[in-house]
UniProtKB/Swiss-Prot annotation:
Keywords: Amidation, Antibiotic, Antimicrobial, Immunity, Innate immunity, Secreted, Signal. It is found in: Secreted. This is Cecropin-C. Disulfide bonds: none annotated. It comes from Drosophila melanogaster.
Length: 63
């Protein structure tokens, strides 16, 4: 019975320590994904601006 309690306690300590070390790795991955999303958003906004300018030039050329 005592062995079981000690085993559970050690298992919990290991799970907590492994969980904390994994959080750093997961946080880095999350930041990379967030950065990719920001770059995609910025490129889309820039592309829409260029497309709007092209549409204005085409409309002006038609008269």
């Amino acid at each position: 019975m005592n062995f079981y309690k000690i085993f559970v306690f050690v298992a919990l300590i290991l799970a907590i320590s492994i969980g904390q070390s994994e959080a750093g790795w997961l946080k880095k991955l999350g930041k990379r994904i967030e950065r990719i999303g920001q770059h995609t958003r910025d490129a889309t906004i820039q592309g829409l601006g260029i497309a709007q300018q092209a549409a204005n030039v085409a409309a002006t050329a038609r008269g």
